[in-house]
């Protein structure tokens, strides 16, 4: 809702609005007889500029503005969806940070990662994703990369899920616990098929004390592939002209 105060005794106004930075005269214009207006049909997570002008009949005042505002975030609806945490991404507006009271909390670092730095008191800090609806084969799997700055002072995190809101108490589902990434980016993949049909938020929850720095990057929401990749490839019985290989099936396949 947009509100303003009359300049004098006028009873009519012109209002114009458009996406941030638009050229006046090219926006949406509305003639009004009240000092408030509810704008509808806007895009989520978008900045808009608004101008208002008094219409005194035979004369008009200069335009007042711009007044800028940013609309709220909606659900993620396009998949696959990737967040690389690059500084300046408007999508970062849709991630929430909850600081449990310690000196440092989750930030979006200048090198394009989400990061949390050590604190002399225990973290109880949440990095919370935007909402999305989990659909089979479309948005039922997440992947992301994580790393620690130090192996000796390694931070850890829990990955939690909420099917209600974004308050810490809402994150009652545990996807992974006590995850300690190495000092080089490691990819993590989690199956969320158990939550098909539900709206969810994910949270990276840090609880460590006085360690170093943890980084999260390339958070992606995607569908579980019809044919999953094998994992755990290892070699054994290494001889001069032969080696035995073994791996774990991705699902129920019987050929490789």
At which residue positions do the language-model features occur?
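Extracellular low-complexity, O-glycosylation-prone stalks/linkers
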Residues: 7-29, 161, 252-256
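Recognizes extended acidic, P/S/T-rich segments that occur
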Residues: 14-43, 57-62, 174-182
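Extracellular glycan-recognition surfaces and repeat-rich motifs
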Residues: 21, 78-123, 253-255
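Extracellular carbohydrate recognition
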Residues: 123-126, 207-224
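Extracellular carbohydrate recognition and processing domains
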Residues: 166-196
